[in-house]
Amino acid sequence: MFKQSVFIKSAANKSGWIEDNIPEVCFVGRSNVGKSSFINTLANNKKLAKVANTPGKTRLLNFFDINNSSFRLVDAPGYGYAKISNSMKVEFGIMMEDYLTTRENLKLVCMLVDLRHKPTNDDVQMYDFLKANDIPVLMIGTKLDKLKRNEIAKNEKLIKETLEFDQNDVFVKVSNLDKINIKESYDALIRLLEVENG
């Protein structure tokens, strides 16, 4: 769990990015995957990443200082929400591609997928994009508590097959509600970021 976490700023484009050498981990996932809840659980702060009432509402990159500048967490807008305009989807695509391909601070992407469902085309495209650009990925399967015991392995297999998951990447199944594997996901994040733990 994060020892310290504080919101710094939001940015719509490169001009708003923070200029320093602090490593960043970017959290991505489709709308309603449980990204804000996962961030809040890691931070042990229910209000850190505001859980938007309307999926796809936040169209900015939100920057958070973690563990007294040990690293930064960058919360990206949820993707795949049908009710936003095509122009907003294009803006989102440009913003994300710019950040993911040119941001030197970016050391890791934490991609969240819903364990209950087969990955969407948006999920597949995001994972393919990350792999094509050699961006390290930590995959988090959310909503573990919503699955029956006999569904867990089957659903994980379906997700990995659909994404053509790289076995060198780490996959952690979590429940924000029951706090299952939160420490394991944090430990994996710290290990992959190669930063000091606190």
Swiss-Prot record:
Residue sites binding Mg(2+) per the record: S36, T58
HAMAP family: GTPase_EngB
Function, in words: Necessary for normal cell division and for the maintenance of normal septation.
Name the record gives this protein: Probable GTP-binding protein EngB
GO cellular component term, pick one: cytosol
Domain EngB-type G residue range list: 21-195
One example GO MF annotation: metal ion binding
Entry binding sites for GTP: 29-36, 56-60, 75-78, 142-145, 174-176
SUPFAM superfamilies (UniProt xref): P-loop containing nucleoside triphosphate hydrolases
Keywords of the record: Cell cycle, Cell division, GTP-binding, Magnesium, Metal-binding, Nucleotide-binding, Septation
GO biological process, one term: division septum assembly
Pfam family, one: MMR_HSR1
The keyword Secreted is assigned to this record: no
Cofactor(s) in the UniProt record: Mg(2+)
PROSITE patterns: G_ENGB
Family: Belongs to the TRAFAC class TrmE-Era-EngA-EngB-Septin-like GTPase superfamily. EngB GTPase family.
